[in-house]
Amino acid sequence: MKRYVIAGNWKMNFTPAEATSFINEIKPMIEGKNNCDIIFCAPYVTIAAAQEAAKGSQIKIGAENVHFADKGAYTGEVSAKMLTSCGVEYVIIGHSERRQYFGETDETVNLRTKAALAAGMKVILCLGEVKEQRLAGITKEVVSMQTKLDLAGVSAEDMKNVIIAYEPVW
């Protein structure tokens, strides 16, 4: 049977109480839907509350970002080791907003991807073109190059823990 992945991120929304309420509303809607993985990637401050609310359901809680270093002077960042110590299994890397607003590059996406995989996490890798590239008709070339650069050095074995999400920057 084909297995589907339904993943979403909450961006900078939901307090812990709102996250709990949202998950409690969703849980009855997905009962018995065993052919899909449902993943909500949450802001760091809501992860614990979301995990607690998701207990006993098929909902998995992930993070919206991860840094490539294990530790250090990276104010505001969180390492893969920190996330896994909190029971976080999934992480989004390369989201269009991270690329657009925070200047994430294919190089930093690659470093983050390898760090998350090394920590045993599952990566939701976002790929996609900017509007100008879409209008120029080079989407396929751009996404192909991103795939090559973002996954450089990632083994075939590690690819079992990578989910590719098409997420354009427009």
Task: Identify the residue ranges that each predicted region occupies.
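Active-site loop-to-helix "anion-binding N-cap" substructures in soluble metabolic enzymes
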Residues: 1-170
